[in-house]
């Protein structure tokens, strides 16, 4: 796909979603390539209550959404903006998320609901990389419906694999959101080989608030797989005087972007690590960094840390690199 700038659309709650003390606003970033984009609310001033969903690749272009939950009084009295940066096209887009004002007539109108606003939205998400590549795990495709109204809570899901309907999906109980709407999730457990062979998974959603069903599809990205290169980097000497030090795992030159990076200490899984999203490099491969924070004492006594990587292009889909303090250092 060629480099394409995103389009940005503000998402505002329906009339029923603005009556509480909190309101959830959204920003839909659609039709861009390649990854990544960054989304900031009020240029970064709004950071709590922000939830940015993973990007989804459809028909060669990415779509991503971000939401922020703020007090209703903030939205009605202050400007709320969504800023989207797309480095590949040097695009910087800003959208104001504006409250809908009451119509002057008839006087019974509380707010004017545009026909295209306040309806449920549908998102589809791929299986986790580790679930797909480890035969002992069960991969699943997930379909998420947001902004389901209290008045019309029934959501019907239909699932298809290569346009053949399947009936094995599971729908989870409705989750009430802070803005008074509901979130509904349906998951379809899939066969490892169906995803790896490029089969298309489709989620079809119907609800009385929708004029017609919404369909979302997803499949494994096409293209030749490239093997990740894994490098471990010890903590800098300047950190040794602190209580915690940072270990780094750099993973480069992989394709597709779907990858799992985890850490272990002396063979036990660690939790205190952060991964960047995969970033598209100049050669059309991806790279990412993972940072693990550890106690300085643990590092100094020679505990062995392992960066563990799962990717489809690796032999047996798995590799790992150890990192420990060299004696005398």
Curated annotation (Swiss-Prot):
One of its GO terms (molecular function) is immunoglobulin receptor binding. Keywords: Disulfide bond, Immunoglobulin domain. Disulfide bonds join 27-82, 143-203, 249-307. GO terms for cellular component: immunoglobulin complex, circulating. Pfam families: C1-set. Residues 98-113 are annotated as: Hinge. PANTHER family: TAPASIN. The keyword DNA damage does not apply. GO terms for biological process: antibacterial humoral response; complement activation, classical pathway. Residues 114-222 are annotated as: CH2. Residues 1-97 are annotated as: CH1. The keyword Disulfide bond applies. Residues 223-329 are annotated as: CH3. This is Ig gamma-2C chain C region. SMART domains: IGc1.
């Amino acid at each position: 796909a060629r480099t394409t700038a995103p389009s940005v659309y503000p998402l505002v709650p329906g009339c029923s979603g603005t009556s509480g003390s909190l309101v959830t606003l959204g920003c839909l970033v659609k039709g861009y390539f390649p990854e990544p984009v960054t989304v900031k609310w009020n240029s970064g001033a709004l950071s709590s209550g922000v939830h940015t969903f993973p990007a989804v690749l459809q028909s060669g272009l990415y779509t991503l959404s971000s939401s922020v939950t703020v007090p209703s009084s903030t939205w009605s009295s202050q400007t709320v903006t969504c800023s989207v940066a797309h480095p590949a096209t040097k695009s910087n887009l800003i959208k104001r998320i504006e409250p809908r004002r009451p119509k002057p007539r008839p006087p019974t109108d509380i707010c004017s609901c545009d026909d295209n606003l306040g309806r449920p939205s549908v998102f589809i998400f791929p299986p986790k990389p580790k679930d797909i590549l480890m035969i002992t795990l069960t991969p699943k495709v997930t379909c998420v419906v947001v902004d389901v109204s209290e008045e019309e809570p029934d959501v019907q899901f239909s699932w298809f694999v290569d346009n053949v309907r399947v009936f094995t999906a599971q729908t989870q109980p409705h989750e009430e959101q802070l803005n008074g709407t509901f979130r509904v999730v349906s998951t379809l457990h899939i066969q490892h080989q169906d995803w790896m062979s490029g089969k298309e998974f489709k989620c079809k959603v119907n609800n009385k608030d929708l004029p017609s069903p919404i369909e979302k599809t997803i499949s494994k990205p096409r293209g030749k797989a490239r093997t990740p290169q894994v490098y471990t980097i010890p903590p800098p000497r300047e950190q040794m005087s602190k209580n915690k030090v940072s270990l780094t795992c750099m993973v480069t030159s992989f394709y597709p972007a779907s990858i799992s990076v985890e850490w272990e200490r002396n063979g036990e899984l660690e939790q205190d690590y952060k991964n960047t999203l995969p970033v598209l490099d100049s050669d059309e491969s991806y790279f990412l960094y993972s940072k693990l924070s550890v106690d300085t004492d643990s590092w100094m006594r020679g505990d062995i840390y392992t960066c563990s990587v799962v990717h489809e292009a690796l032999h047996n889909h798995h590799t790992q690199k150890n990192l420990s303090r060299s004696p005398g250092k």
